[in-house]
């Protein structure tokens, strides 16, 4: 077959006592904005969600740089306004028909929950982004608008290789190699799919710790304190009324 299973990688947030790599998440946002945003939407993400790794002022300025649909004016005519924190991230296309027309009939998937929606999750996304350029197996026929990628189902994908070395410049100066950009945008998409990952993980540890304390306390009480009550016996002594 032409399909390959993505290799499992040591993502930090899968470790016991580590969370999301927030520097990587922020860099991944840069990759998304400059490479993937023109085609792929984030329909479940609002600008205020970016405050998880950006300042409120940065988020306000980012939202205001886009125009969104506003309520119609007194004449009923449509109008625009600068975006605000509570607005959904601006979508690249107005509707599905426009998206398909711009992509040779294919509908670019929304990336809001892509790591949850694809088998293999982050491993699949990273493998897909770095899987171009492999030798095409015999029997696989490609048109001029198709590419071979062993990690895509069927091996034939309509999306051209999205990443090339040094195609962007990171704000923090990190070298923008293909593996680096693939790793960063994958971390960003993992955050989009699971924005409360760290909070849920911390809550899980707190729950485990609380249950452990309750279990130890209950065991101690049962072993050393409740024995006093369990060893007591009630005896019925009838009252002697003759005295």
Swiss-Prot record:
GO cellular component, one term: mitochondrial inner membrane
Name this polypeptide is given: Cytochrome c1, heme protein
Subunit structure and binding partners: Component of the ubiquinol-cytochrome c oxidoreductase (cytochrome b-c1 complex, complex III, CIII), a multisubunit enzyme composed of 3 respiratory subunits cytochrome b, cytochrome c1 and Rieske protein, 2 core protein subunits, and additional low-molecular weight protein subunits. The complex exists as an obligatory dimer and forms supercomplexes (SCs) in the inner mitochondrial membrane with cytochrome c oxidase (complex IV, CIV).
Residue spans crossing the bilayer: 202-221
Top EC category: translocase
Binding residues annotated for heme, in chain numbering: 39-40, 159
Subcellular location: Mitochondrion inner membrane
Cofactor requirement: heme
Species, as recorded: Euglena gracilis
Annotated ranges, domain Cytochrome c: 5-194
EC number: 7.1.1.8
Membrane-protein topology: Single-pass membrane protein
